[in-house]
Curated annotation (Swiss-Prot):
GO molecular function: rRNA binding; structural constituent of ribosome
Domain of life: Bacteria
Keywords: Ribonucleoprotein, Ribosomal protein, RNA-binding, rRNA-binding
SMART domains, per database record: Ribosomal_S4, S4
Family per record: Belongs to the universal ribosomal protein uS4 family.
SUPFAM superfamilies: Alpha-L RNA-binding motif
Protein's UniProt name: Small ribosomal subunit protein uS4
GO cellular component term, pick one: small ribosomal subunit
Length: 208
C-alpha cells in the first residue's frame, strides 16, 4: 500500500479529531477540524451509526494516521507488541513512540511527524554519532540523536531551533538546547503518551 499523499486535513476530519498532522496550523483557527466538524465528502454531514467493528477499525486507522504507518508496518508492530510481556495496547504505543521520527518530533526538532520523517530521510540527524536516514529505527534507553552541524544554519532549522524549549518534551526524553541533541532516558509509560487513542479497541480488532 502506498503512503497517503493527499490533503492531510481530510484525514483529521475523517476521524473526527485532531491528529496534528500539519504542525502549528493545527493549533490555530485555520484547523479544518475546527472549521468543519463533519467528515469530508458528499455525505459527510449525515449522521451515521457506527458498529463496534467500525469503532475498532476507526481507532486503528486513527493510530496509523497519527504515526504515519502503513498497514503492513502497523500489523508488524502489533505482532511484536503481542509477543512482548505486559499490556499489548501499551506495548504497541511504546513501539510507535520510540520510532526515530516520532522522537525527533517529540523533542521539538520538527513541527509534525511527517516533517520529522522527511528530516530523517534527508540526513539531518545523527544517532549515537553516526549517520542515520531510517525513520522507523527503534530507539532504546541511552540513545542520543543530534542535529547535524551543516543543518543548523539552514533557514528552516534556524526557525525551529529558535523555538526549542518552548514546548517541554515528555518525561522519557531529555533535550539539550545547547548541543541541539536529545536523549532517551526511559521507555515511555502510558501516562507519558498524550496521543488521544483508545488502544484497547485496536487490540480487540486484531483479536477477532
Amino acid at each position: 500500500m502506498a503512503r497517503y499523499t493527499g490533503p492531510v486535513c481530510r484525514l483529521c476530519r475523517r476521524e473526527g479529531a485532531k491528529l496534528y498532522l500539519k504542525g502549528e496550523r493545527c493549533y490555530t483557527g485555520k484547523c479544518a477540524v475546527d472549521r468543519r466538524t463533519y467528515a469530508p465528502g458528499q455525505h459527510g454531514q449525515g449522521r451515521k451509526k457506527i458498529s463496534e467493528y467500525g469503532l475498532q477499525l476507526r481507532e486503528k486507522q486513527k493510530a496509523r494516521r497519527v504515526y504515519g504507518i502503513l498497514e503492513g508496518q502497523f500489523r508488524a508492530y502489533f505482532a511484536e507488541a503481542d509477543r512482548q510481556q505486559g499490556v499489548t495496547g501499551e506495548n504497541l504505543l511504546r513501539l510507535l513512540e520510540t520510532r526515530l521520527d516520532n522522537v525527533v518530533f517529540r523533542l521539538g526538532f520538527a513541527r509534525s511527524r511527517n516533517e520529522a520523517r522527511q528530516f530523517v530521510l534527508h540526513n539531518h540527524f545523527t544517532l549515537n554519532g553516526k549517520k542515520v536516514n531510517i525513520p522507523s529505527i527503534q530507539l532504546r534507553v541511552g540513545d542520543v540523536i543530534q542535529l547535524k552541524e551543516k543543518s543548523k544554519d539552514t533557514p528552516l532549522f534556524k526557525e525551529i531551533v529558535d523555538g526549542l524549549g518552548q514546548k517541554t518534551p515528555p518525561a522519557w526524553l531529555e533535550l539539550d538546547v545547547n548541543t541541539l541533541s536529545g536523549r532517551v532516558i526511559a521507555l515511555p509509560k502510558r501516562e507519558d503518551i498524550d496521543t488521544n487513542l483508545q488502544e484497547h479497541l485496536i487490540v480487540e480488532l486484531y483479536s477477532r
